């Protein structure tokens, strides 16, 4: 009885595919990437995916194990969310990729919303190619 079970487990182990991390294809980052570094005793980690050297899909950023930022890439746009140390949403908005020759830059674009640690909206800002166009402070009516 143990021999068939052992053979089955051996078959499962041999058929499992290993997911490679931090790989390059044609000298460009490709697939799942996990990057870690420490700065001033804070351990930072980012987890996401690259396709042909460009970040794609969802990325998450941590400081000492706590989420500090999430990004969702779709073509030349990226939906960004920043978080307070308590885990509450701090800011959210869109960035847009603009290429000029060899220069590539992500700019804040459209309306961004900023929240306090109690999750109340406190400021909205409107951006165009990274330039602040307008800002509106939200009066807190809660007491």
Regions flagged by a language model, labelled:
Residues 1-23:
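Bacterial Sec-dependent N-terminal signal peptides
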């Amino acid at each position: 009885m143990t021999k068939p079970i052992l053979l089955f487990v051996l078959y499962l182990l041999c058929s499992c595919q290993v997911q490679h991390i931090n790989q390059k294809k044609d000298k460009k980052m490709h697939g799942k990437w996990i990057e870690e570094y420490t700065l001033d005793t804070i351990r930072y980690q980012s987890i996401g995916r690259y396709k042909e050297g460009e970040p794609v899909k969802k990325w998450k950023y941590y400081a000492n194990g706590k989420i500090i930022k999430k990004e969702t890439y779709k073509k030349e746009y990226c939906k960004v969310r920043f978080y307070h140390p308590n885990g509450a949403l701090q800011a959210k908005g869109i960035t847009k990729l603009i290429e000029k020759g060899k220069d590539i830059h992500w700019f804040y674009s459209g309306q961004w919303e900023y929240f306090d640690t109690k999750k109340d909206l406190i400021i909205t800002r409107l951006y165009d190619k990274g330039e602040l166009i307008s800002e509106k402070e939200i009066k807190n009516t809660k007491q």
